[in-house]
């Protein structure tokens, strides 16, 4: 049986991941049909969705940064065994809204826990699984925060409320990851129109899948 293909969408808050997925999924479904599995993090399965409510909700402002990192990793571990690993083993294309790179950028960089420390936690949680392709939406932190406050006033989560300096560290860490892993992580200019971003993303996905299909 053909081995599955794992794609992740990453980016700082306000970069437009939701818009990209809304524009991208219809085209991908037309191409791949039932072979495409869409999911998200934290979440994707029941236990992980429950953790999502705790770690992203506004109910626990006292949450320690290490607690935060471990909760994200715990949600990811359950997501892996219940959804991602079985789908990949079945030869599916898995498209996830966020994965390990988010933890490295947000907790490793933004929370200053360190890239190596957060990487080790998540290596244990995922048994070392890495995506085949990661699309990183990038834009200035000031622009991203402005978008959040303008368009997502009813859905702002705990991480959205962090200071600008936090979000700048997140972006810097993402860009460092892309610099270190250029074959896997492809950077998309998130200041472009949603339609243009979706076209570029679809092209990158199709190019990456040429040897797989």
UniProtKB/Swiss-Prot annotation:
Gene3D superfamilies: P-loop containing nucleotide triphosphate hydrolases
One Gene Ontology term, aspect cellular component: cytosol
Molecular function GO labels: ATP binding; dTMP kinase activity
PROSITE patterns: THYMIDYLATE_KINASE
Record-stated family: Belongs to the thymidylate kinase family.
Source organism per UniProt: Oenococcus oeni (strain ATCC BAA-331 / PSU-1)
Gene name of the encoded protein: tmk
EC number: 2.7.4.9
Protein name: Thymidylate kinase
């Amino acid at each position: 049986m053909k081995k599955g293909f794992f794609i992740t969408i990453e980016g700082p808050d306000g970069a437009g991941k939701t818009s990209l997925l809304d524009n991208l999924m219809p085209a991908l479904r037309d191409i791949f049909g039932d072979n495409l599995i869409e999911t998200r993090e934290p979440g994707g399965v029941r236990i992980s969705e429950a953790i999502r409510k705790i770690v992203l909700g506004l109910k626990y402002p006292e949450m320690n940064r290490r607690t935060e990192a471990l909760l994200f990793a715990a949600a990811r571990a359950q997501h892996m065994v219940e959804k991602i690993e079985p789908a990949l083993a079945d030869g599916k294309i898995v498209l996830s809204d966020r994965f390990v790179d988010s933890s490295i950028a947000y907790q490793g960089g933004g929370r200053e826990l360190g890239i190596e420390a957060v990487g080790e936690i998540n290596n244990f949680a995922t048994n070392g699984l890495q995506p085949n392709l990661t699309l990183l939406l990038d834009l200035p932190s000031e622009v991203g925060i402005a978008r959040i406050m303008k368009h997502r006033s009813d859905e702002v989560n705990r991480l959205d409320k962090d200071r600008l300096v936090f979000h700048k560290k997140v972006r810097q860490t993402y860009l460092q990851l892309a610099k270190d892993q250029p074959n896997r992580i492809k950077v998309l200019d998130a200041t472009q129109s949603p339609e243009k971003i979706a076209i570029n993303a679809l092209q990158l996905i199709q190019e990456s899948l040429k040897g797989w299909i």
